[in-house]
Amino acid sequence: MKLNRRVTIITRFSGIMFSLLLLGGLAACSDDNNGNDTPEPEPSTYPTTPFSKIELKEVIESDAQPVTATHTYLYNSAGRLTSYTGKQSFTAGDELFEIENTTTVEYKDHQAVITDEASTVSTYTLNDKGYATTCTSQDMAGNTRTYTFSYLINTEDKYYLENITEKLDDGKEYSFITIDYSNFRALRIQQKVDTFEHNSTATTPSGNEIANISEIPSLFITDMYPLSMHAVAIYGKILGEPANYLITQLIPDSNGESEETTTYTYTLDNRGIVTSCHAVVRHIRNGYEQDYTRTVNYTIE
């Protein structure tokens, strides 16, 4: 007889988001039937997202057994992100195990407070438009990290994240990401973590762009430190607006002989909403082409 057992483990949230033109939206709070309401400051000035749920699911292969990872972002009736739940499911023997963590989002006057199950509290200070200018994140042990954010503002007064800078307890700058929007079809991304530097270009095809009406960030952005620490804020549009188009290719500057390129292929439903993204990392090693693939399925409603 097959047994199902659920195991809940408290884990520190670390994200999965973003070609910086691609973010989804922070939204205003009001009553709904799911208990997702939080106080709403200045609802007319804050960005919103037009969905109640954005969920990502993928199967991650491992040497032991495949793991199904699910990331669920819930929005209230006014379109503001209220919670994130991350879950990993796997079968060992005849037993089903689930590792789950939940992160909540609370809105106050010019603030968004994000708290995970490990009691890490990230407090974002918001400007009058609802976008974060600073963040202070403190874990249960009392360790503190601070972040500053700057944006490109377009002619429609929309904000797109241009820079995130992280400082540690001692005030030392530890990491940053800078996005250059000079060419919206070829975003230049500069990343530095401690002494490591990495530059890349995120592109979308000229004349064959895919409209990002799904308002989702590109997969690589929320994998990229320090933005990986802010995936909930990214999906809540606390860190900026979505792009008009989906990124389809990421090319590192340092690919050299490896010719490394990541290609993103999207499947859309009849509304034009993304239902899946297939990512292929292709590079040359010892004269042979090697591929790493991942497929993420989306439920957006």
Protein language model regions, located:
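Bacterial N-terminal signal peptides that target proteins for export
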Residues: 2-16
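C-terminal motif of bacterial Sec signal peptides marking the signal peptidase cleavage site
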Residues: 24-28
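Hydrophobic helical h-region of N-terminal Sec-dependent signal peptides
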Residues: 18-22
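Buried hydrophobic residues that stabilize the cores of well-folded domains
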Residues: 32-301
